[in-house]
Amino acid sequence: MMATISDRSTVVVMKDQVSCDLSGEAAILNLKSGVYFGLNTVGASIWKLIQEPKKVSEIRDAILKEYDVEPDRCEADLLALLQELLEKKLIEVKNETGQ
């Protein structure tokens, strides 16, 4: 069962991947599946933040400080990106219940 991501969830990158910076954007390779995944500048900023475990609320606050974006849009886009990274098995999600 896929974990539900909320602002209280903690996310961190999976170990089975490698990534590199490409002129401010990021390219990620899932070592198990062999699939590449690309991130734009904002996505790359988020990727850098989650190299260590971070709460979604901390990531959102960092993005709001760095970029000119409405808080609701920021949260919706952040949750959508994290869900996509989770589905591609590039991140782990831990909720307060230990999931």
Residue ranges of model-derived segments:
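Long, charge-rich, low-complexity alpha-helical segments
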Residues: 35-99
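Acidic, low-complexity/disordered tracts enriched in E/D and polar residues
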Residues: 1-44, 48, 94-99
